[in-house]
Amino acid sequence: MEQQPKMVTGWAARDANGLLSPFSYPLRAKGDEDVVVKILFCGICHSDLSTIKNEWGNAKYPVVPGHEIVGVVAEVGSSVARFAAGDTVGVGYIASTCRACANCRDGFENYCAGLVPSFNAALPDGATVHGGFSELAVVNQRYVVRIPGGGGGASPAPLDRLAPLLCAGVTVYCPMRRLGLDRPGVHLGVAGLGGLGHLAVKFGKAFGVKVTVISTSPWKEAEAVERLGADAFLLSTNAEQMKAAAGTMDGIIDTVSAVHDLTPLITLLRTHGQLVPVGSPGKPVQLALYPLQSDGKSVAGSMIGGMRDTQEMVDFAVEHGVAAEVEVIGMEDVNGAMERLQKGDVRYRFVIDVANTMARAR
């Protein structure tokens, strides 16, 4: 007799109003290389909000979002050697890649043309991929990272604060590493102080670099310097401050997701300095070319990170005490959290306590 698929509960959006509610669906059958993860916590990324509201026109309803997952291994497939039941693990944005292209071979799976996200997607065999707003996830072992510190949830940092590292953390960590903005003596600018920006500050200080936060909000100065440990704060609407800081930064991680002119940030860079936009404005941004050309400056793209880099980032974060500032919510509060996220009313990342609240939210 054919075995019936296990039914699990997640929270899904059914249409572009983005309202999430309980959704029962069959868990994908475990393959030989798969890990079954009991989800403990899942962060909420702005791309989750954009997807459930179909802002990018690619929503495949019903959508179970979530790609900042921390959990415990419940089962492993017969060919899995890297993980065992009880291991604490993380799952980020990647569910599958081609494994054959140059990017995959070089550890840059995040740039594979065949990348399948860990939510709102389908695997090459047609199986639907649901995200982390759910009880369980089945993930190929290649796209799972180990959370150091022991099994069953033991870790040097609370697991809820590690969940956002699986997307937001690796998004800012990778370009800092790749472009040499992780060395003592470097002056790093961080534009924007939200979910991505506050982690860029934390990683920068863990690397031992000088960090200046650049923001349009004067009230964020105390937050940046006193709470997060930034060395300086630059109010981008203050012409005198911007002029005084011109040509002083080796690189800038631009986390701003709203449409904005990049030229003022370019003026802050030293010769051969690099601007890395990691926010995702919905429309084209403005950039004057001459300030780039006149001093050999550049704009560098970056998107999340490959699996090798993601594991390295998690290991570094745990060793150096880098963790997100979070507001933990129950699954039943997720729609209110999405509304607040739309308004920018979060400091700095929402994380759902999936394991302890899913049952009561059904």
Swiss-Prot record:
Zn(2+) 2 binds at C98, C101, C104, C112. Keywords: Lignin biosynthesis, Metal-binding, NADP, Oxidoreductase, Zinc. InterPro entries: ADH-like_C, ADH-like_N, ADH_Zn_CS, CAD-like, GroES-like_sf, NAD(P)-bd_dom_sf, PKS_ER. It is an enzyme of class 1 (oxidoreductase). GO terms for molecular function: cinnamyl-alcohol dehydrogenase activity; coniferyl-alcohol dehydrogenase activity; zinc ion binding. The keyword Oxidoreductase applies. Binds 2 Zn(2+) ions per subunit. It catalyses: (E)-cinnamyl alcohol + NADP(+) = (E)-cinnamaldehyde + NADPH + H(+); (E)-coniferol + NADP(+) = (E)-coniferaldehyde + NADPH + H(+); (E)-sinapyl alcohol + NADP(+) = (E)-sinapaldehyde + NADPH + H(+); (E)-4-coumaroyl alcohol + NADP(+) = (E)-4-coumaraldehyde + NADPH + H(+). Pfam families: ADH_N (PF08240), ADH_zinc_N (PF00107). Transmembrane segments: none annotated. It comes from the Eukaryota. Its cofactor is Zn(2+). Zn(2+) 1 binds at C45, H67, E68, C167. Involved in lignin biosynthesis. Catalyzes the final step specific for the production of lignin monomers. Catalyzes the NADPH-dependent reduction of coniferaldehyde, 5-hydroxyconiferaldehyde, sinapaldehyde, 4-coumaraldehyde and caffeyl aldehyde to their respective alcohols. This is Probable cinnamyl alcohol dehydrogenase 9. The gene is CAD9.
